[in-house]
Amino acid sequence: MTTEHAAGAQTLNFQAEVKQLLHLMIHSLYSNREIFLRELVSNASDACDKLRFEALDKPELFEGDSELAIRVGFDSEAKTVTVSDNGIGMSRDEVITHLGTIAKSGTKEFFSQLTGDQKKDAHLIGQFGVGFYSAFIVADKVTVVTRRAGLAAAEGVKWECAMTGDAAGEYTVEAIEKAARGTEITLHLREGQEDLLSGWKLRGLIRKYSDHIVQPILMKKEEWDKDKNEQVTTDEDETVNQANALWTRSRNDITEEEYKGFYKHVGHDFDEPLAWTHARVEGRHEYTQLLYIPSHAPFDMWDRNARHGIKLYVKRVFIMDDAEKLMPAYLRFVRGVVDSSDLPLNVSREILQESKDIDTIRSGCTKKVLGLLESLATSDEAADREKYATFWKEFGPVLKEGVGEDFANKDKIAGLLRFASTHADTPDEVVSLADYLARMKEGQDKIYYVTAESFNAAKNSPHLEIFRKKGIEVLLLTDRVDEWVIGNLPEFDGKALVSVAKGGLDLGKLEDEAEKKETEKAADEYKELLEKMKASLGERVKEVRVTHRLTDSPACLVADEHDVGMNLARILKAAGQQAPASKPILEINPQHPAVMRLKYEERQFDDWAAVLFDQALLAEGGTLDDPATFVKRINQLMMAMGGSAGTD
């Protein structure tokens, strides 16, 4: 609904998602109210960055004033706090788009991520680009006055929203005269927020959250008036923050708190980073990199098409957000800044696609991040190893993508992988391939693994029986991406990675001659049974053979060496893709009573053969085409085994 006023003001209703968000701000995040100033200052900084970038091609946008700054002020009598900037500003359409709606693409994800924990929810605000609305945590009315650089003074815009009375959920937009470009946001404070009407308080918040902002944040200087016995505001400006590019300073001059504060700005995050690396690269290509590993995964981490992470500067001039070409897709969670001395100031995303300089920077950044992760993973310090464990829980599945995407760094990435295994017998992925190699049995020349849909399915797989008997460790792979990872990682440190559920099982020196002869003898002894079972099962199996991989189970299904495994086939089917046609091999345990009975079974042979196959299929995590027939067969066999009890 839209209402026109005689004075030219237009009243509009908020998008439903914005109403929901405003309710959240007001009622759920009040204990994290300080974030409002951080978010508004961060937005003002972005507006200044955007103006400087657009002015590279259109210097007239500066309108004779290229000294970009952010100003924070307050009025004790009016009970207002004001944040203003002389950045790019907004047109009327931009005001309605940016302040009246939230991008549909992020709305559902934002609300699905909310936990009810105020601290956790607060960090989502900046991450989802809805920081402006945090103003309503402390204000019941917000007034925005803005004009886009390059537009006439008469094309200024006033936006206003009061979250009280009947007007709650509505906002007004009207045309006004505004001589200076940029944006001014005035917060009319709620009752109980009067402590913000203090220069000391506001300066403290700026230094706490926004000290790293590149533009100067100005406030009117305050002096002590002896006669009035209070602080009074002067007409002189003072810069509250350090107002320099943090990444250009020497590492020795930057405190840990400054690094963390800058991350919260550049990463739009409320939490502290897990780790960071800061370096200046000199030589043929000169650039500075300040790269952070977040402590938690972003909401859109699985969207490989979303632009992520790295801000690109050229000679300290902001060029673009989310310069995706600076980091490979499998490191899309990395946040930070790259400042190049070699790229042209008018660089575009199209130029980045073709730039060899960018390829060099990308390679350098990738190695730096992988090196940082490696140093955490292999550190002698328990705290660092704990950080890597946290990293792996949050980002491990994404890092795995690099095995198949980054051939140059494949070995380094493989060394960073972590898996569950039969050694620990817990679902925690804490075992590295190097750990596995260090525990290998004497004479073992392969790394064994099994893939399954869940940890319990993997650890209880019948394929592990012989390995448990011999004390051989097996990696338990249950992540959907693991099948793809293993397909791109045939070996590690000269040792082949081998599935325990594919092909003929060759334990090499781990299998003694007596066992081999016993298996060969059983194959001859059960030859007639194997042929009979193959005939009974028909097209359901490629082959039936005797196995030595089972100790407790009667049978298991095995994929042929070059066929798609059953777990991968299920994953492909779930993704709507057709797996290459293949039939499993049924392996039977000649020592199991059920198999021994089958050798002499005549009347219900087909039922026994079908049940053994179906049980093996279920043990693999498969599904039955005809569960009712399976149950019927089981019932018939149980009744037959019970004889004619109760008829005497």
Curated annotation (Swiss-Prot):
Protein name, entry field: Chaperone protein HtpG
Question: Which residues are in coiled coils?
Answer: none
Instruction: Please give the Gene Ontology molecular function terms for this protein.
Output: ATP binding; ATP hydrolysis activity; ATP-dependent protein folding chaperone; unfolded protein binding
Which species?
Aromatoleum aromaticum (strain DSM 19018 / LMG 30748 / EbN1)
Q: Note whether Transcription regulation occurs among the keywords.
A: no
> Taxonomy-wise, where does this protein's organism fall, top ranks first?
Bacteria, Pseudomonadati, Pseudomonadota, Betaproteobacteria, Rhodocyclales
Name the HAMAP family on file.
Answer: HSP90
Primary location recorded for the protein, binned into one broad class = cytoplasm
Gene3D superfamilies, per database record: 3.30.230.80, 3.40.50.11260, Heat shock protein 90, C-terminal domain, Histidine kinase-like ATPase, C-terminal domain
